[in-house]
């Protein structure tokens, strides 16, 4: 897929994503089988496609809430400064919480979010990330569930964007810049 100044090459197919999301849903269902108080927290904006698919595969009743935190802006690399742009609407104290993230890169965003949510005294808190880039990690953080471990490449699709574009791609692709100015 060619764009002005860059090309998107498919890395993970829509079929592979669907199969992995189904498996993650089964694993999460098993882990939370004894709860009736699960709150699934999606980190906006990148996780919205993943969370929509994932909650349909989770076999326990759940509420969905969203939090928007960012360390990217319009850049392709993390700025390391985490800003909360939209907080949860509901209360998570005493609840089982599953935080759903699109990608764990340096770890700064998810670490800050998990710290902030733990301070609200949930009964239990776990994290599920669609993608993990362990080679970029600067903060010691790990999701309990991960869809795919990927190399240090800039990716788009399945909710992930480049300057707010390409979230609608059904696959995950790598961005290869063809313009030396980028």
Swiss-Prot record:
Highest taxon in the source lineage: Bacteria
Cited function: Purine salvage pathway enzyme that catalyzes the transfer of the ribosyl-5-phosphate group from 5-phospho-alpha-D-ribose 1-diphosphate (PRPP) to the N9 position of the 6-oxopurines hypoxanthine and guanine to form the corresponding ribonucleotides IMP (inosine 5'-monophosphate) and GMP (guanosine 5'-monophosphate), with the release of PPi.
PROSITE patterns in the cross-refs: PUR_PYR_PR_TRANSFER
Pathway entry: Purine metabolism; IMP biosynthesis via salvage pathway; IMP from hypoxanthine: step 1/1; Purine metabolism; GMP biosynthesis via salvage pathway; GMP from guanine: step 1/1
A biological-process GO annotation: guanine salvage
Cofactor(s) of this protein: Mg(2+)
Pfam family, one: Pribosyltran
Binding residue positions for Mg(2+): 101-102
SUPFAM superfamilies associated with the record: PRTase-like
Residue positions binding diphosphate: 45-46, 167
Main location as per UniProt: cytoplasm
Family stated for the protein in its record: Belongs to the purine/pyrimidine phosphoribosyltransferase family.
Known EC number: 2.4.2.8
Cellular compartment(s): Cytoplasm
Active-site feature positions: 105
Parts of the chain that traverse the membrane: none
Class in the EC hierarchy, top level: transferase
Residues reported in the UniProt entry to bind GMP: 133, 154-155, 161
Reaction(s) this enzyme catalyzes, per UniProt: IMP + diphosphate = hypoxanthine + 5-phospho-alpha-D-ribose 1-diphosphate; GMP + diphosphate = guanine + 5-phospho-alpha-D-ribose 1-diphosphate
Gene3D superfamilies attached to this UniProt entry: 3.40.50.2020
Protein name, UniProt field: Hypoxanthine-guanine phosphoribosyltransferase
